[in-house]
């Protein structure tokens, strides 16, 4: 059960499960299904199996079930990884972070159901779950990198790219928070057309300000990632890990911008909105991978 041969498929399945947790949370918010089980948690309308199953109850129950299964899968993964590849420096802290933030995510979700938190607190939920996802994602990448197909262990990242990548990570996380706030504040269609309502640029409500703030953050995110991408491919042309990694990040942010624009143009089409959540999830995951490589470079400086 905890054999080393299970590591790769466990990593893939756990990463996919965490992806479904992210998408499930976005689906709950987008469809207004957060109250699908009333104010009961972990029960649903005070029962293990509710008497009626309207669509919002099905969505909320499904999200809870996937979250519970993902916790079990992540526990299985981290125990196996700790046992067999715990000698790799990042495995143990990533294991603790992945489980810890997954539990914290569940507690915040439960608090939101029971005590009805305000939008600014609820917006933290997606960001916290994103940290848990990224930790699982990194464990999986480490498992596959043991084969050293891309020689990532020998990669040395210089200070200019390190600074840009740290800035990129911080800006992305701020953008994630504002995006989650847009969903929770029901501001997806606020502040007129995209990219700006040129006929009336002045925000007139809190929702307008939330939406405008997110658009500004999205523009900053795109700009920083584009600058970082150009720097990376220009200065590391022969390193496949950097070249492919930052290229993938740039493609993901382009897709993120496109789906963000289409969400507004289509009056928040659900499929497009879920792709919007998917792209930012993997963009942040890629960014945390760059940070892990950077920290290895910092350690090599000290040796």
Curated annotation (Swiss-Prot):
Pathway field: Porphyrin-containing compound metabolism; heme A biosynthesis; heme A from heme O: step 1/1
Record's catalysed reaction(s): Fe(II)-heme o + 2 A + H2O = Fe(II)-heme a + 2 AH2
Active site as annotated: 60
The protein's Enzyme Commission number: 1.17.99.9
Ranges of the Extracellular topological domain: 30-67, 115-125, 185-215, 266-270
Keyword vocabulary terms for this entry: Cell membrane, Disulfide bond, Heme biosynthesis, Iron, Membrane, Metal-binding, Oxidoreductase, Transmembrane, Transmembrane helix
Membrane-spanning parts: 9-29, 68-88, 94-114, 126-146, 164-184, 216-236, 245-265, 271-291
Cofactor list: heme b
Disulfide topology: 37-44
Quaternary structure note: Interacts with CtaB.
Annotated function: Catalyzes the conversion of heme O to heme A by two successive hydroxylations of the methyl group at C8. The first hydroxylation forms heme I, the second hydroxylation results in an unstable dihydroxymethyl group, which spontaneously dehydrates, resulting in the formyl group of heme A.
Name of the protein this chain belongs to: Heme A synthase
Species the sequence originates in: Staphylococcus aureus (strain NCTC 8325 / PS 47)
Top-level taxonomy: Bacteria, Bacillati, Bacillota, Bacilli, Bacillales
């Amino acid at each position: 059960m905890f054999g080393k041969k299970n590591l790769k498929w466990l990593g893939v399945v756990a990463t996919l499960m965490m992806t479904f947790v992210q998408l499930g949370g976005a689906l709950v918010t987008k469809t207004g299904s957060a109250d699908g089980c009333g104010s009961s948690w972990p029960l649903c309308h005070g029962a293990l199996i509710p008497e009626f199953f309207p669509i919002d109850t099905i969505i909320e129950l499904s999200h809870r079930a996937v979250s519970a299964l993902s916790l079990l899968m992540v526990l299985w993964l981290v125990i196996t990884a700790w046992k067999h590849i715990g000698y790799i420096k990042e495995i143990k802290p990533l294991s603790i972070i992945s489980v810890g933030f997954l539990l914290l995510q569940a507690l915040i979700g439960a608090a939101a159901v029971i005590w009805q938190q305000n939008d600014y607190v609820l917006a933290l939920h997606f960001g916290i779950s994103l940290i848990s996802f990224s930790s699982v994602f990194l464990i999986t990448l480490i498992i596959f990198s043991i084969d050293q197909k891309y020689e990532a262990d020998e990669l040395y990242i210089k200070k200019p790219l390190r600074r840009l990548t740290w800035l990129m990570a911080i800006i992305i996380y701020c953008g994630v928070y504002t995006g989650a706030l847009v969903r929770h504040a029901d501001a997806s269609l606020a502040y007129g057309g995209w990219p700006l309502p040129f006929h009336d640029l002045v925000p007139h409500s809190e929702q307008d300000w939330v939406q405008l703030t997110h658009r500004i953050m999205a523009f900053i995110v795109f700009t920083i990632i584009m600058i970082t991408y150009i720097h990376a491919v220009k200065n590391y042309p022969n390193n496949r890990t950097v070249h492919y990694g930052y290229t993938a990040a740039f493609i993901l942010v382009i897709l993120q911008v496109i789906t963000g624009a289409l969400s507004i143009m289509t009056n928040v089409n659900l499929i497009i909105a879920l792709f919007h959540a998917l792209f930012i999830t993997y963009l942040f995951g890629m960014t945390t991978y760059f940070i892990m490589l950077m920290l290895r470079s910092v350690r090599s400086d000290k040796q």
